[in-house]
């Protein structure tokens, strides 16, 4: 089930494919400090740029990342096998349009389940098809006469507030791979470009091909950062699953106070790193 080439470069470990959804038990963390727990799951994320820092995470989650509810784990357990089968079929015959079409159907169902039922975006998840203004506002394009244009698949929205953009892509070995459509950028780069569109009011994005999931931070001022996780490792590494789902929950994107939302966590992480450097 492993792809033919590594998913991404750098720090990612635990890439062996899993086939279900494990429990939310944190018994393995016994005897370790909260900072060590955060450091461990961060070490399993393929990060690039100024990603979330251990001090900031420890301050917000002094007891560690909260576990996922049993109901949400059951939703994942029921939905994941269909995605696994579709990926395997596509991976065995990558040049077939039929297998790609079949994979897209399975991917879309899986992504919808993760966003609405696992992350809890139900009622707030809005597609660009339903809200054309998303495509108009967050459009990004390459330079040149024959420009390649990309728009978000949808977004988490509360009223007119955009909490996170979402881009769903075709299957690939890595979300950091440069596209083959004439624009020499990766899906992650394209999300960053959309987040920095002239009319953007959002700095957080999510990009996925179904298997790989990336969290992207791209403030208008400052460096972009991203972290990629493999949903196949959500079995043997539930801590990364729970951290990913908690950080992309409604309360971290459009709920609570701004000081406890994901954009501020990225901002504070940059400041913390600068203080250490000084």
Predicted regions and their residues:
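Short, basic/polar, glycine-containing "phosphate-handling" surface segments that engage DNA
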Residues: 1-101, 159-278
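Generic alpha-helix structural propensity
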Residues: 105-110, 149, 185-189
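Active-site metal-binding core of divalent-cation-utilizing nuclease and nuclease-like domains
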Residues: 119, 123-160
